[in-house]
Regions:
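Primarily recognizes the serine-hydrolase "nucleophile elbow" in alpha/beta-hydrolase
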Residues: 136-210
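C-terminal catalytic histidine-bearing segment of alpha/beta-hydrolase fold enzymes
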Residues: 248-316
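N-terminal cap/lid segment of alpha/beta-hydrolase-fold proteins
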Residues: 23-59
Length: 316
C-alpha cells in the first residue's frame, strides 16, 4: 500500500512547546540505565552498553538497540534525552540497549567531500562492527537479558542511524563483516533511522536477503547526512530518499516521513516522534503488516535553528 500525504502545521506555539519539552527533558536519576555491560576492549578503550529493563516478570521481551548520533566524533550515549527515550521504551515493555562504538572521525579535518570518502568509510566500518558485536552479545546472552532473539530492532540517530541502516545492509548482502558476527539466518525485526544513510563501494543493491521493515525520518534540506545521495562511480553514500527508491522498486515494507525544507535537526526528534516509533513497531514489526508509506511533513512557520547552517565544514 502506497500513501503520500502532506501535512501543514499551523499551531506554531503548541508545536514549539511540545518539541522543546520533548528534546530537553529535565535530568532524572530514574532515567539512568539499570545495568552497564562492557562488550568490547580495544587497547585502553572499553566499549559499554547501557541496559534498561521493563519492570515485569516476563521471560522474553522485544529488544531495541539504540545508537546515538555525534558525527562519529562525540560520545552522546548518556545524553539526557537519550536516557529519557530509552527509559520510556523500557517502561513500555522493551529491553533497551544503548550501545557505544568507536569514533572514527575524531581528529579528522574536513578537506572536501572526495577526501572524506576514505575516513568516512573507515568510521562507518568500525562503528558498524561494534554494533554487530552488540547484536551478537545480545543474541549470546538473550536468556540472561530476557530478550526474544527474533525481535531485535535497531534504532539510530544521525551517525547511529547510519550504522543501523548499514548493519542491516551488510546482513542483506552477507558481507564478510556480517558473516563474522551474525549467525546464519539471523534477521533484524526492524530498523528505525533518524537521518541515516548507507555507504557502499559496489553500488546500492540488496543481493541476498530482504531488508527488515524500516522507518525513515529525514529532513529534505539536511546538510550533514545527505537526504538524496552522493555518488562517484560505484562509490556512494545513499540517504533516505535514495534508499526508499530501492525499497519502492522491490516492494520492501517501509515508511518514510520527509520533513520538507528541514535540516539535520530531524535526527534528534526521537522523543517528539515517539508515537510514530511505537506505531511502526506495533503495526509493521509486531503485527507484520506490509505497508509502503510515504509522508511529507511541512511546517511553514518553522523557526530557524543552528542546524540549518551546519555542514561538514563546521563539524570537522
Amino acid at each position: 500500500m502506497a500513501m503520500k500525504r502532506i501535512f501543514c502545521l499551523f499551531a506554531l506555539i503548541c508545536f514549539t512547546v511540545i518539541i522543546t519539552r520533548a528534546q530537553t527533558p529535565q535530568d532524572s536519576a530514574r532515567w539512568n540505565p539499570d545495568e552497564v555491560i562492557a562488550f568490547a576492549q580495544y587497547d585502553t578503550l572499553t566499549l559499554e552498553m547501557d541496559c534498561y529493563f521493563p519492570n515485569d516478570d516476563a521471560e522474553q521481551h522485544r529488544c531495541i538497540i539504540f545508537s546515538y548520533g555525534g558525527g562519529f566524533v562525540d560520545n552522546n550515549q548518556r545524553q539526557v534525552s537519550i536516557r529519557h527515550f530509552c527509559r520510556r521504551l523500557a517502561d513500555d515493555g522493551f529491553v533497551v540497549v544503548a550501545s557505544n562504538y568507536r569514533l572514527g572521525l575524531q581528529g579528522v579535518r574536513f578537506k572536501g567531500p572526495l577526501r572524506m570518502i576514505k575516513p568516512l568509510e573507515n568510521a562507518i566500518g568500525m562503528a558498524s562492527e561494534d554494533l554487530m558485536k552488540v547484536t551478537r552479545y545480545v543474541l549470546d546472552y538473550a536468556s540472561e537479558l530476557t530478550v526474544d532473539p527474533q525481535q531485535i530492532i535497531l534504532v539510530g540517530s544521525s551517525a547511529g542511524a547510519i550504522i543501523s541502516l548499514q548493519c542491516d545492509y551488510e546482513r542483506c548482502n552477507r558481507t564478510d563483516l556480517a558473516l563474522r558476527y551474525l549467525p546464519e539466518g539471523f534477521r533484524y525485526a526492524g530498523v528505525i533511522a533518524f537521518s541515516g544513510a548507507i555507504f557502499t563501494r559496489k553500488g546500492m543493491k540488496y543481493t541476498h536477503d530482504r531488508p527488515a521493515p524500516t522507518l525513515f525520518f529525514h529532513g529534505t534540506a539536511d546538510k550533514l547526512v545527505t537526504y538524496k545521495k552522493f555518488k562517484l562511480f560505484n562509490i556512494g553514500f545513499y540517504g533516505s530518499d535514495a534508499i526508499v527508491r530501492q525499497f519502492k522498486a522491490r516492494h520492501y515494507p517501509h515508511k518514510i516521513i520527509r520533513f520538507q525544507d528541514e535540516s539535520h535537526i530531524v535526527s534528534i526528534r526521537y522523543l517528539a516522534n515517539y508515537e510514530e516509533v511505537r506505531w511502526f513497531i506495533d503495526k509493521m514489526v509486531v503485527d507484520a503488516h506490509h505497508y509502503e508509506i510515504d509522508e511529507t511533513f511541512f511546517d511553514p512557520f518553522r523557526p530557524k535553528t543552528q542546524w540549518d547552517t551546519i555542514g561538514p565544514g563546521e563539524m570537522y
